[in-house]
Amino acid sequence: MVLGKVKSLTISFDCLNDSNVPVYSSGDTVSGRVNLEVTGEIRVKSLKIHARGHAKVRWTESRNAGSNTAYTQNYTEEVEYFNHKDILIGHERDDDNSEEGFNTIHSGRHEYAFSFELPQTPLATSFEGRHGSVRYWVKAELHRPWLLPVKLKKEFTVFEHIDINTPSLLSPQAGTKEKTLYCWFCTSGPISLSAKIERKGYTPGESIQIFAEIENCSSRMVVPKAAIYQTQAFYAKGKMKEVKQLVANLRGESLSSGKTETWNGKLLKIPPVSPSILDCSIIRVEYSLMVYVDIPGAMDLFLNLPLVIGTIPLHPFGSRTSSVSSQCSMNMNWLGLSLPERPEAPPSYAEVVTEEQRRNNLAPGSACDDFERALQGPLFAYIQEFRFLPPPLYSEIDPNPDQPADDRPSCPSR
């Protein structure tokens, strides 16, 4: 008898949302089919599936051991969320010599259903970063006697939902900073910055209304700007590696000496980005809005307001929905939004981060490449174009702390 051949082995998921994207949350049932097409008859020992979800980080650092000796230190850590195995056809036995227990599959197309339940405990949102990832996948393995197994792995996306309607994410965020410029023995007037946003939580596709007042009492021309940053933090063996990425930004009008500019709800749109990851012990993804004043020839004055990017949008008049699948469907809509036009570069990395901080905490290489890689993960596979400039990195340490309110010089009248 001439044995047949395996023409194709594929995996398909039963989607829970209207966008036909396999997206799930903790407690959901993941179901689908392993599709097998053969030409002629084949004998099969087993058809197995293996489903797994895990977060993993890895990076290396060069060390100097003295006497012109260097070595590489590896940092790795992993968290497993679930590990499920099932046999769709056959048995576990690996004996090829026994004819007993083999299954015959006839020529044509065949479907084998599978299902498993995700844990009820919180799961980290799917993510791809420079030094780590959160991945969920199903692997099918077809075992035949005296032949190598046929294997296929397919990823699916998990959202750990963040509801921005919670009180902590609805609270306004505000701050004030001031800076006085010095040039040799001359002291210029201060530059002051106050900014406020209506809440902390947003979803991709929303626009942040920025309320700000910038007063320029210095002798220089300055430019107020705002930018959204993503911060990826990876943890292993008591160490932390950090990557910071520009997401979106805007520019105000140039402000001459003695002038004041007011933003009454200036809009900055959030592009399609990964939700915040706040509950994973080895990977953390956070966002912030930086409102700053670009000062030629001096370190910029900047103010950071924390953001949380969620998955369940703001409900008008307090209306709520309890359907996780409908929330998924609703949130799939913003994933198709177009990316913004190429933003201008924010303040330079050297202006706001010391050399020591850079060596200790920040990763080398282009952070833009990291963000492109994140957007190419299963959650954003359909985003075709990425036009961000390579962003500089920044620190939240303010080298010019606020002066006491009573000591603030007033801008001279003109």
From Swiss-Prot:
GO terms for cellular component: cytoplasm; early endosome; endosome; lysosome; plasma membrane. It is a peripheral membrane protein. This is Arrestin domain-containing protein 3. GO terms for molecular function: beta-3 adrenergic receptor binding. Adapter protein that plays a role in regulating cell-surface expression of adrenergic receptors and probably also other G protein-coupled receptors. Plays a role in NEDD4-mediated ubiquitination and endocytosis af activated ADRB2 and subsequent ADRB2 degradation. May recruit NEDD4 to ADRB2. Alternatively, may function as adapter protein that does not play a major role in recruiting NEDD4 to ADRB2, but rather plays a role in a targeting ADRB2 to endosomes. The keyword Cell membrane applies. It is found in: Cytoplasm; Cell membrane; Lysosome; Endosome. Residues 405-414 have a biased composition (Basic and acidic residues). Residues 393-414 are annotated as: Disordered. GO terms for biological process: fat pad development; heat generation; negative regulation of adenylate cyclase-activating adrenergic receptor signaling pathway; negative regulation of cold-induced thermogenesis; negative regulation of heat generation; negative regulation of locomotion involved in locomotory behavior; positive regulation of hippo signaling; protein transport. The gene is ARRDC3. InterPro entries: Arrestin-like_C, Arrestin-like_N, Arrestin_C-like, Arrestin_domain-protein, Ig_E-set. Keywords: Cell membrane, Cytoplasm, Endosome, Lysosome, Membrane, Repeat. A motif (PPxY motif 2) lies at residues 391-394. The lineage of its organism: Eukaryota, Metazoa, Chordata, Craniata, Vertebrata. The keyword ATP-binding does not apply. Its main location: cytoplasm. A motif (PPxY motif 1) lies at residues 346-349. Pfam families: Arrestin_C, Arrestin_N. Interacts (via PPxY motifs) with NEDD4 (via WW domains). Interacts with ADRB2. Interacts with ADRB3. Interacts with HGS (via PPxY motifs). Does not bind TXN (thioredoxin). Interacts with ITCH.
